[in-house]
Amino acid sequence: MTTDRNLFFCASLLIFLGVLMSYSLSTYTTVVLYHYGEFHFFIRQLVSAIMGIIIMWGLSRVDPRKWFSRLGFFLLFVPSLLIIGMFFLPESLSSSAGGAKRWIRLGFFSLAPLEFLKIGFTFFLAWSLSRTFVAKEKANVKEELITFVPYSFVFVALAIGVGVLQNDLGQIVLLGAVLAVLLVFSGGSVHLFGLIVSGAFAISVLAIVTSEHRILRLKLWWSNLQNSLFTLLPDKLANALRISDLPESYQVFHAGNAMHNGGLLGQGLGLGQIKLGFLSEVHTDMVLAGIAEEWGFLGLCVCFILFSVMIVLIFRIANRLKEPKYSLFCVGVVLLIGFSLVINAFGVGGIFPVKGLAVPFLSYGGSSLLANCIAIGLVLSLARYTKG
């Protein structure tokens, strides 16, 4: 089998596993909390999965020389306009949650424009960086900073639209990481990368300390982390460093219990306990904890192996491509998938604060699934282009 066929098969297998877990982990939530039919979330995710696989296959057949840029700019501008437009829509079409509007209701389907904007932003970076950093000869840090200034304005606008209007710092962290690493892949120096990371860290600290909600999340994270870290220290030193009266991290605590209950081989599909009201939305952001409980450590390893294979295959395709914008886009897709997985996994494990990022292909959510299928479909079209 060729690389692109392996990639299509790998993505389809992850999608199948995601649909399977959307049923196994959502039954309690569906029936008890929302009073829907038992198969409500399963059917919605199954429909999204079928649509996603069809879209992925269809995009793999298009000629990127004609359609890549058109689709990329479409995914950049249309979701941006929708994110702005959501705040002018009535509650019946775009309901508020925590002071933010993130979904547009379209009858049976709810659309999250940000998921598609992430693909459009990755395209924009690949298209633009190939015309600036890649096209230029090696420059000093000052010249690199001057070249980077327009990107900083674009990112600030994105941060306002997503981080402020949608109150979603996690997505900004993800997109900022993609921007910083793609700069290195496009020829930016390590010094520039260090300056950008330092600036991003300072801005992140400012964003956290000015939000009570984010401060609480940070406290929840440290509450769990200090309990783990201080077991390695002598009792006197641990007691001196420990900050008392911190709230317990509800999500991470039960996620840890789920992983402990799963052991090596798991409780069995559908037999997990964490979904029974302990973490009612386990089929979304905490899906890895649900998989660990029902499939065990080995089942979780299988998922990570599939993601690793997918990343290697996309890198192989990127290495074959001669046009920088195509190869940079493939690298950007790897970064989106890889960083989303790592940030989510570290959040579930208590290493990072919980950010609310979905696990690509596995977490429940039609918009996230379709957006990732579009990304893989575009990569497959580029792989086919290298043959023709």
From Swiss-Prot:
Cytoplasmic side stretches: 1-6, 60-70, 127-144, 187, 316-327, 380-388
Its EC number(s): 2.4.99.28
A GO CC annotation given for this chain: cell division site
Catalytic activity: [GlcNAc-(1->4)-Mur2Ac(oyl-L-Ala-gamma-D-Glu-L-Lys-D-Ala-D-Ala)](n)-di-trans,octa-cis-undecaprenyl diphosphate + beta-D-GlcNAc-(1->4)-Mur2Ac(oyl-L-Ala-gamma-D-Glu-L-Lys-D-Ala-D-Ala)-di-trans,octa-cis-undecaprenyl diphosphate = [GlcNAc-(1->4)-Mur2Ac(oyl-L-Ala-gamma-D-Glu-L-Lys-D-Ala-D-Ala)](n+1)-di-trans,octa-cis-undecaprenyl diphosphate + di-trans,octa-cis-undecaprenyl diphosphate + H(+)
Subcellular location(s) per record: Cell inner membrane
Keyword RNA-binding among UniProt keywords: no
Membrane topology according to the record: Multi-pass membrane protein
Pfam family, one: FTSW_RODA_SPOVE
Intrachain disulfide bonds: none
Keyword annotations: Cell cycle, Cell division, Cell inner membrane, Cell membrane, Cell shape, Cell wall biogenesis/degradation, Glycosyltransferase, Membrane, Peptidoglycan synthesis, Transferase, Transmembrane, Transmembrane helix
Keyword Transport assigned: no
GO annotation (BP), single: regulation of cell shape
Gene Ontology molecular functions: lipid-linked peptidoglycan transporter activity; peptidoglycan glycosyltransferase activity
Periplasmic compartment segments: 28-38, 92-105, 166-168, 211-294, 349-358
Enzyme class, UniProt record, top EC level: transferase
Residue stretches spanning the membrane: 7-27, 39-59, 71-91, 106-126, 145-165, 169-186, 188-210, 295-315, 328-348, 359-379
Pathway annotation: Cell wall biogenesis; peptidoglycan biosynthesis
Record-stated family: Belongs to the SEDS family. FtsW subfamily.
Purpose: Peptidoglycan polymerase that is essential for cell division.
Protein name: Probable peptidoglycan glycosyltransferase FtsW
Gene: ftsW
